[in-house]
Amino acid sequence: MVTNNGDGEHLGIRRNGNLRHPSNNMKIPRRAQSTVLNSNPFYSRKYSMSTLTPRDICRSVDSRVFVDMSSPNFQTLEDPHRDEIINSVRLNYLNSSKRSSVSHGNEAIPRVNPTKNSSASTIAAANVDSDDDETNLSSAGGDITHDIYKLVKAEDPKRLRRPRSMENVTPKIEHHTKLSSASGLNVPGGFRREFIVNKKRQEHQLNDSASSDFTSHESDSINQSSPSSNQDIDKVPFLTRNFLEFLYVFGHFAGESFEDDFIPDSSNMMIRGEDERSALLSRPDHMKVLPSAKGTTSTKKVFLILLKSFIGTGVLFLPNAFHNGGLFFSVSMLAFFGIYSYWCYYILVQAKSSCGVSSFGDIGLKLYGPWMRIIILFSLVITQVGFSGAYMIFTAKNLQAFLDNVFHVGVLPLSYLMVFQTIIFIPLSFIRNISKLSLPSLLANFFIMAGLVIVIIFTAKRLFFDLMGTPAMGVVYGLNADRWTLFIGTAIFAFEGIGLIIPVQDSMRNPEKFPLVLALVILTATILFISIATLGYLAYGSNVQTVILLNLPQSNIFVNLIQLFYSIAIMLSTPLQLFPAIKIIENKFFPKFTKIYVKHDDLTTRVELRPNSGKLNWKIKWLKNFIRSIIVIIVVSIAYFGSDNLDKFVSVIGSLACIPLVYIYPSMLHLRGNSLPETKGEFWRFKPMLDTILIFFGIASMLYTSYQSIFGV
């Protein structure tokens, strides 16, 4: 018997239940979506795949789903039910794999109608309903059926055409839920299959809800949006759209999910466990999931996002850091730390890929156990608290200089300015949704860029015009043996950005290009750091201040405005820097869910998980606000006590917190997750030895530079 797929394309020959050698020109149509092989499925597939070309193999894998009909789940006592079961399985469980093709814009959206005359050995998809005219025309007989499809579409008044720019934001799990129907149950074994599938769905939803990703639930309005609202996304200005993706990345700092739950205020949502009273057919879940930016960010946007994450206040500390380390030593070490940082970021992504998890802490948990996750999260908290404290000191010193130069109020005590920042930061710390920080942070990035341009202009003017290219007095060209450890900490402080590496790589449309993008970002940041630091140090020599802005002409209106705007920028960026630390600490005090045991009249007990959200309980909300206020006060206090020695404060944060986070933990994770498995536990091979050397070098550097920064200088 010659089996044909309905489009006139030869699939193979079957006689007496045995599969003969298929034709070398065998092609599987793109429109066919599911195939059920009747007899000897494994042998048939193995035999056929061995004779196919790579192109045919890719096409067959891409367009078909194979189901083993010899499985006990598909055996019935009566053969007449066989075709009905096959059609039911195909229609209800196999045809959702291509739904996501809508977003690609060049795939058809198939709609398969079962036919009673379908062969038991091969069921071909027919009656393809596609919005893509090219797909119809490229198929066999497409020129004949093209006008028929158009006529049917035109006569259907209820049919809505999906615009090509509209993305399919409906979650995949929702597709499966909606596919359950009476036609899928009205066949032998239908209830059993539906119960098994429903059980798996509920387990999947329970696991997702119990994890940190549960916090991205949104209201029902997301699927009720019209096509025009989806098209409006493309009209958002490039910089704004790019920065919103930057906020998404910060909401998943180090791979953790720090977005608060988007539960409506009026909801009383619970997640119920299963017992013997659970219904076989549950009601469809109407809870919609907020579409994430995962897998959609272009390479250019990733470059800008990473570059913005590396450029902040650290670059303004580098001219003074060059004075601490010496010019040539500082330039060479800055280039070394750029290469070192790139390698550690790269092996962290490799460790993530080998472990199959998307969180810095979860990688440590999987490879070493809970203790590793604890110290990773602790280091993240210390780093973000240190960054926030440095930002507060920076803001206070620049506001102090601005008020003195413009309003001539004298040098205000830093304690007043610290109290002023506390009053601002406490309400901002109450923000749960990170997207509400978009406008302040967008302005902050604009002011930072403008400030860097002003710094380059004024330092270049002083060096090349005022000093006629002659370096200022006090420049140390070699190594400053007395203060070089302060440079190490400050340089690492400037290069620290490991918290955004994992979420940025996850959000890429083409993650295989991440190493190249990361290399370009590190190279660009290194060139920018060396240029600004060298210009500033040569222009002011030994008189260079901890923050280079304080060396600029204080009577110049542009300098005064930059001091004001840069201070505002850093002040508006501080809540974003503090956000991950607050969420990590808060998650330790408040678990995501609270177990509730519900007893029924028949003495059975059901376990329910109630979200521990402030939107459901005002006491929890204000208790969280109280803890956030305490965290802000602690950070401000740390900043106040470290304000007298800002360069030492920054160096200690870089040495004590950033070195283990950037240079020790990634090497440890890569050693256990990649190097040892690849070499079968042989430590003397190159990769394990390299990871081990990096670990001990990082530990020695952390201990020595931290000690020298605190006690030795």
UniProtKB/Swiss-Prot annotation:
InterPro entries: AA_transpt_TM. GO terms for cellular component: fungal-type vacuole; fungal-type vacuole membrane; vacuolar membrane; vacuole-mitochondrion membrane contact site. The modification Phosphoserine is found at S88, S130, S165. It is a multi-pass membrane protein. Residues 1-33, 99-121, 200-233 are annotated as: Disordered. GO terms for biological process: amino acid transmembrane export from vacuole; amino acid transmembrane transport. One of its GO terms (molecular function) is L-isoleucine transmembrane transporter activity. This is Vacuolar amino acid transporter 4. It comes from Saccharomyces cerevisiae (strain ATCC 204508 / S288c). The lineage of its organism: Eukaryota, Fungi, Dikarya, Ascomycota, Saccharomycotina.
